[in-house]
């Protein structure tokens, strides 16, 4: 059981009846709160919740419809995303309580101050290195317009400017990270065919691929609903079309790919997880056609080449700059 869920269950009498759990973990909480519903933007968590509690959790960037007597937000990492989610929840809770739960090292005390916009925050509990806060919504705010919160920036690429649209909560929100910047400089000479941007974020790599290889089918895969929404906006902004896939990892990718191109993710909340990246390296061969290529950017300190060579083939370093390397291997 997630420690945040355990903190909620210490006050179980507060969470009876129709309740919305936003950003909930994939644990037993829905089973222990039989009238609660979930709102998830993590495809992996949603898949587990859907398998165990069919019809009780929704994967989306928008608050699910329903008449909830209360809502709980499990604190996300991004302050901007927290602002959006709190406003979305508060907009439907006039005269009702909104709860915020999170880990101390995740910044719950700082985030609790964001509740003050809606009323006087109260700390209800502190246990398992987590805190539970609440606020009674005195006057509901307007429903937030997610698209209006997007940040747009322009990249000057060799084949012309590319507009990137970034929503709150997406990796490197409102800017181009150094790893992706290096990868954008090394997208030439990829095999023709079906191309995948794995861990697409705001869609910068996928959009660049589609423009560079217009006759190729391009797919963008991410675990996060806000990333996929950002990618959709980025593609539309540049007049491009590509397939978007909500997936838990490389196992969700299509087969017979000509190339997998990636700035693979390794952050989840306040924790660092390399599992999705390592799965990409160990399983890429299953999704590539003969002669298909894996091309990725990674921090130089990560020992990826031995893993790539063990599971795919000889690994070449195409470039190195500012603590990052571009690796390439073919099946």
From Swiss-Prot:
GO terms for cellular component: cytoplasm. It comes from the Bacteria. SUPFAM superfamilies: S-adenosyl-L-methionine-dependent methyltransferases. Its EC number is 2.1.1.172. It is found in: Cytoplasm. GO terms for molecular function: 16S rRNA (guanine(1207)-N(2))-methyltransferase activity; nucleic acid binding. The keyword rRNA processing applies. Pfam families: MTS, MTS_N. Keywords: Cytoplasm, Methyltransferase, rRNA processing, S-adenosyl-L-methionine, Transferase. It catalyses: guanosine(1207) in 16S rRNA + S-adenosyl-L-methionine = N(2)-methylguanosine(1207) in 16S rRNA + S-adenosyl-L-homocysteine + H(+). Belongs to the methyltransferase superfamily. RsmC family. Specifically methylates the guanine in position 1207 of 16S rRNA in the 30S particle. Monomer. This is Ribosomal RNA small subunit methyltransferase C. It comes from Ectopseudomonas mendocina (strain ymp) (Pseudomonas mendocina). The lineage of its organism: Bacteria, Pseudomonadati, Pseudomonadota, Gammaproteobacteria, Pseudomonadales.
């Amino acid at each position: 059981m997630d420690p945040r869920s355990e903190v909620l269950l210490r006050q179980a009498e507060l969470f009876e009846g129709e309740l919305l759990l936003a950003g909930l973990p994939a644990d037993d909480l829905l089973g222990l709160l039989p009238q609660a519903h979930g709102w998830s933007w993590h495809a992996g968590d949603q898949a587990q919740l859907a398998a165990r509690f069919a019809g009780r959790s929704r994967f989306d960037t928008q608050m699910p419809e329903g008449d909830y007597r209360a809502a709980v937000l499990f604190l996300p990492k991004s302050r901007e995303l927290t602002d959006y989610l709190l406003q979305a929840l508060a907009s439907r809770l006039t005269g009702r309580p909104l709860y915020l739960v999170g880990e101390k090292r995740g910044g719950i005390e700082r985030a609790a101050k964001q509740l003050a916009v809606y009323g006087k925050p109260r700390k209800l509990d502190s246990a398992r290195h987590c805190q539970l806060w609440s606020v009674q919504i005195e006057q509901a705010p307007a429903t937030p317009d997610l698209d209006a919160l997007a940040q747009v920036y322009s990249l000057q690429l060799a084949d012309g400017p590319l507009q990137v649209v970034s929503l709150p909560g997406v990796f490197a929100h409102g800017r181009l990270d150094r790893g992706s910047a290096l990868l954008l400089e090394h997208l030439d000479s990829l095999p023709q065919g079906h191309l995948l941007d794995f861990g697409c974020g705001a869609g910068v790599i996928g959009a660049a691929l589609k423009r560079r290889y217009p006759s190729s089918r391009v797919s963008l895969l991410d675990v996060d609903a806000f990333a996929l929404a950002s990618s959709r906006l980025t593609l539309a902004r540049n007049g491009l079309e590509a397939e978007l896939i909500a997936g838990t990892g490389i196992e969700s990718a299509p087969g017979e790919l000509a190339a997998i191109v990636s700035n693979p993710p390794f952050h989840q909340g306040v924790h660092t997880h390399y599992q999705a990246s390592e799965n990409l390296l160990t399983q890429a061969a299953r999704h590539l056609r003969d002669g298909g290529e894996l091309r990725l950017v990674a921090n130089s300190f990560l020992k990826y080449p031995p893993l790539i060579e063990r599971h795919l083939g000889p690994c070449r370093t195409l470039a190195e700059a500012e603590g990052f390397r571009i690796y390439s291997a073919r099946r």
